[in-house]
Amino acid sequence: MNLEGEAKFSMDVNQLWNSLLDEEILKKVIPGCHELVLKENGEYDVVLKLGVAAVKGEYVGKVKIEGVDKPNYYILHASGSGSPGHVKAEMHCRLFGTEDGSRLEWNCDAEIGGTIASVGNRVLGGVAKFLAGKFFKDIQKAVKSASIESPADSAIKME
């Protein structure tokens, strides 16, 4: 599955870069995040609890940032598995300064297997875009204030 998108921010590109790599901010804004621990090798251990329609559960995985060109570009590698299935993804992130802040363009290739794959690429693509949009909006909010809004009710449950 291939996904892409962009998000605009009122903060400058350096502040955006720092926010995207700040462990405490990430713990607050990653949808369904129950645990995020930075290891010595630069890799994160992560535990997420997410649900799509009737398929929900816990995913345990790893995230690593590579190909860093601060504050312009990085590649995020993520993999995880749990009772609903497994996910492996590579996401390319490009950051740009703009007149009124910054912009992030992203594209992601993801392999999804197990029960969660039975939901279908069309639904999963919509869910992934929704979660990415929520993540980027919450990054903006986290930088503006310490409080993060609770997730809206939808077919997507964050436990």
Where are these regions (language model features)?
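Hydrophobic ligand-binding cavity/cleft-lining segments
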Residues: M1-K49, M158-E159
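Intrinsic-disorder/low-complexity, polar/charged segments enriched in Ser/Thr/Lys/Arg/Asp/Glu/Gln
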Residues: N2-E6, E43-D45, E58-V60, Y73, ...
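Hydrophobic/aromatic beta-strand elements that line small-molecule binding cavities or substrate pockets
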Residues: A7, H34, G61-G67, A78, ...
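A generic beta-sheet turn/junction motif
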Residues: F9, L50-A54, D69, G82-P84, ...
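Mobile acidic interaction elements
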Residues: V29, E35-V37, V60, V68-Y73, ...
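Glycine-rich portal/gate segments that line the openings of hydrophobic small-molecule binding cavities
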Residues: V37-S79, K134
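Beta-strand/loop substructures that line and gate deep hydrophobic ligand-binding cavities in soluble
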Residues: G80-V127
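A conserved amphipathic terminal alpha-helix motif
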Residues: G113-M158
